[in-house]
Amino acid sequence: MKKLKIIIDILLFIITIALFNIGLIGNLMHEILGIALAILIIIHILLNFKLIKQVTKNFKKTNTKTKIMYIIDILIMIIYLGTIICGILIANEVFNFHMSSSLGLVLTHLILGRLAIITMFIHLGLHLDRIFKKVKNEKFKKAIYIIYIFIVIGITVYFIYTLTHSFQWLYAFENSNW
């Protein structure tokens, strides 16, 4: 069971990152991976349901870090759910609801997609102590944490840059009455 959880977590990470670059993987693969991501999220929640139920039941009694992690996990779930719903609605390969030209849905999908990745990195950061539990060398552990922080900051800055410089924003403002 533990190995399955780790495999699911790794797949969630890889697919989330792969979904970011639609130009590289194409629309069809983006939609297929989005569906796979939704399925993996459901499996991830089911595999961790006992823990989720326990923390929910004892929320007031849990420590601050667990409360923060729990709130972030709920936020991640809401963000991913919004991303997936918008993605399905604007899809034009696997599904076709003829809404792919809905600028509001496209922008919501883009924003939530980036927020999903950022919150995923926060989630991973809060779990790094569990991930590196077996690492005995403190200097190596500290170096990994520092590298992780720089990677997260770099990716976050890149996502903000690409979001603010993407063609969707230009299109939105060109066609608005503002």
Kindly give the residue locations of the regions a language model identified.
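Membrane-embedded alpha-helical bundles that constitute the cytochrome b-like, heme-associated redox core
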Residues: 1-178
